[in-house]
Every structure is written in structure tokens, then in C-alpha cells.
């Protein structure tokens, strides 16, 4: 059975260095480009006809549109409408990364959301963006969110450090949650796939048990791919709500 960790190895496709800095075009980069291309193609096909009675592509796009619009409306309010393009793009990028990682794509096949550096970069963009929005909207009054309104002043020495730690841990928790779930799920699939191959090669009936389990886990993993994209996006909406409304 192949090492289940090998699937997370970044492979350079176009080696390139600038001095001592490695900026090679890797399988991870290729999958990100592929995701963006497929998202663009999907949205282009969905708006091409603009029929009164929507077709399959348009219906799927409208489902995603209404889903994200509703998420923003419920968690941020009407003021969150201006941030729809970013939140929608974020959701689609995470979702396609999760789903494409499940596909047996030759040469470039890779789940970029299973690498913490990628998920942390996305989480950092959300964190910095939300912080900038908070200060742009409230100025220095944004700092008041680190000391809950109505709390006794004597508790400031305890509450402020706790709020600061909670605030600055947001990008880490956001990144690790997505990375860990995708990594663990793919490892389980790889291990169970190895059992199916090894047992199925010698015994038909014993191999059927792990195959059935693998099929169930695969279906579950597709659900988790959608769920993790949802969780990453809704937490971003909650952070955006805090920046706009200050709790």
C-alpha cells in the first residue's frame, strides 16, 4: 500500500528559482489555476443564455448565488451586500479546491486546501481585510471591541488580553480547521483504498467490505468538502459582521 502522506507532496512542474528563492510552478499552483478556470467557465456558461426559464447551468449558478447572498444577509445584514463578490469568490475557490482534490487528475492532481500554508494565506486575507474594514468604518473606536461594553473597568486587565488573543487567533483557527479536515479525510480514503486493493487482489468477499466502506466514506468526503467551504465562508461572514457592527 502506498504511503498515504505522499498525496500531499508538492511537486514542481516548472522549476524556477530567483536567487535562493524557489518560485517553481507546482502541482498546487496548477490546481489553483485549474480551479479558477473551471469557476470562470461555470459562471460563463450559466449567464450565457439568461433565459427566463433557467437551464441546468443557470439553475446551479442561481443556487450558489442565492446561498451566498442569503448567508451574507443573515449574518452581516444589508450592509454586507457590497462584499458579496469577495465572499462568493472565496466560497467557490475553497469549494472547487476541495472537490477537485477528490478527482483522480493525472500529473497535477492535488488538494491545495489540504496544505496549511494555502489555507492560512486565505485566512490571513480575510483577517487583514476584516481588520481594515473595521478601522476604516469606526476609526480608533474599533479598539473598543476588545473591551465589552458595560463590563466593569476593573476587569479590563483580564478581558482585554483574552479578547486580543481570541481576535488574533482567528486566522489560525480558520486555517487549521479547513486544512485538518481535508487532510484527515484524504488520508482515510487513501488507507481504505489500499485495503481494497490489497484484499481484493486475493479475496473477493473480504475485499468487498472495505470497498463498501470506502464508497460510503467517499460520499461522506464530498459532503465534507461542501461543508468545509460553507464553514470557512460563514466564519468569514461572522468576522465581517463583527467589524461592521462591533459585536
From Swiss-Prot:
InterPro entries: ATP_synth_F0_asu (IPR000568), ATP_synth_F0_asu_AS (IPR023011), ATP_synth_F0_asu_bact/mt (IPR045083), F0_ATP_A_sf (IPR035908). Its main location: membrane. Gene3D superfamilies: ATP synthase, F0 complex, subunit A. It is found in: Cell inner membrane. Key component of the proton channel; it plays a direct role in the translocation of protons across the membrane. F-type ATPases have 2 components, CF(1) - the catalytic core - and CF(0) - the membrane proton channel. CF(1) has five subunits: alpha(3), beta(3), gamma(1), delta(1), epsilon(1). CF(0) has three main subunits: a(1), b(2) and c(9-12). The alpha and beta chains form an alternating ring which encloses part of the gamma chain. CF(1) is attached to CF(0) by a central stalk formed by the gamma and epsilon chains, while a peripheral stalk is formed by the delta and b chains. This is ATP synthase subunit a. It comes from Paramagnetospirillum magneticum (strain ATCC 700264 / AMB-1). The lineage of its organism: Bacteria, Pseudomonadati, Pseudomonadota, Alphaproteobacteria, Rhodospirillales. The gene is atpB.
Amino acid at each position: 500500500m502506498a504511503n498515504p502522506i505522499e498525496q500531499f507532496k508538492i511537486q514542481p512542474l516548472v522549476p524556477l528559482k530567483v536567487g535562493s528563492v524557489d518560485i517553481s510552478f507546482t502541482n498546487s499552483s496548477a490546481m489553483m489555476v485549474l480551479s479558477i478556470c473551471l469557476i470562470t467557465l461555470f459562471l460563463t456558461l450559466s449567464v450565457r443564455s439568461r433565459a427566463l426559464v433557467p437551464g441546468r447551468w443557470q439553475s446551479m449558478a442561481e443556487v450558489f448565488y442565492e446561498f451566498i447572498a442569503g448567508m451574507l444577509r443573515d449574518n452581516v445584514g444589508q450592509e454586507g451586500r457590497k462584499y458579496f463578490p469577495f465572499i462568493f469568490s472565496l466560497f467557490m475557490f475553497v469549494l472547487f479546491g476541495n472537490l477537485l482534490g477528490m478527482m483522480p487528475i493525472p500529473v497535477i492532481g492535488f488538494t491545495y486546501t489540504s496544505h496549511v500554508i494555502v489555507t492560512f494565506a486565505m485566512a490571513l486575507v480575510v483577517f487583514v481585510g476584516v481588520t481594515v474594514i473595521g478601522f476604516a468604518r469606526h476609526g480608533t473606536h474599533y479598539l473598543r471591541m476588545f473591551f465589552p461594553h458595560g463590563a466593569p473597568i476593573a476587569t479590563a486587565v483580564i478581558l482585554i488580553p483574552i479578547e486580543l488573543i481570541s481576535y488574533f487567533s482567528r486566522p489560525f483557527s480558520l486555517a487549521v480547521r479547513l486544512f485538518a479536515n481535508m487532510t484527515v479525510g484524504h488520508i482515510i480514503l487513501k488507507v481504505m483504498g489500499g485495503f481494497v486493493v490489497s484484499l481484493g487482489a486475493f479475496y473477493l468477499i473480504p475485499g468487498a467490505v472495505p470497498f463498501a466502506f470506502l464508497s460510503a466514506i467517499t460520499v461522506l468526503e464530498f459532503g465534507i468538502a461542501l461543508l468545509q467551504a460553507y464553514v470557512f465562508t460563514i466564519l468569514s461572514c461572522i468576522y465581517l459582521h463583527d467589524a461592521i457592527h462591533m459585536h
